[in-house]
């Protein structure tokens, strides 16, 4: 059986942690910052973990 290929769009958006969880960045961070509060912008800077339902789909696209 051939090797699984990595889905490159997924690889650019997600990173696996050492324990096997998947990290993601927040949406709404490219423009229109004047309409967002300082607190909201600060929280958007931090990375988040992928939810368990999405993890099942993403893990097949990131074979490594």
From Swiss-Prot:
InterPro entries: Ribosomal_bL35, Ribosomal_bL35-like, Ribosomal_bL35_sf. Pfam families: Ribosomal_L35p. One of its GO terms (biological process) is translation. GO terms for cellular component: cytosolic large ribosomal subunit. GO terms for molecular function: structural constituent of ribosome. Residues 1-64 are annotated as: Disordered. Residues 54-64 have a biased composition (Basic and acidic residues). Signal peptide: none annotated. Keywords: Ribonucleoprotein, Ribosomal protein. The keyword Signal does not apply. Disulfide bonds: none annotated. Residues 1-26 have a biased composition (Basic residues). NCBIfam families: rpmI_bact. HAMAP family: Ribosomal_bL35 (MF_00514). Belongs to the bacterial ribosomal protein bL35 family. This is Large ribosomal subunit protein bL35. It comes from Oceanobacillus iheyensis (strain DSM 14371 / CIP 107618 / JCM 11309 / KCTC 3954 / HTE831).
């Amino acid at each position: 059986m051939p090797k699984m290929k990595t889905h490159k769009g997924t690889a650019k958006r997600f990173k696996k942690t050492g324990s096997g969880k998947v990290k993601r960045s927040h949406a709404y961070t490219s423009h229109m910052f004047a309409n967002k509060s300082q607190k909201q912008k600060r929280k958007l800077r931090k990375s988040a973990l992928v939810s368990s339902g999405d993890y099942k789909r993403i893990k097949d696209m990131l074979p490594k």
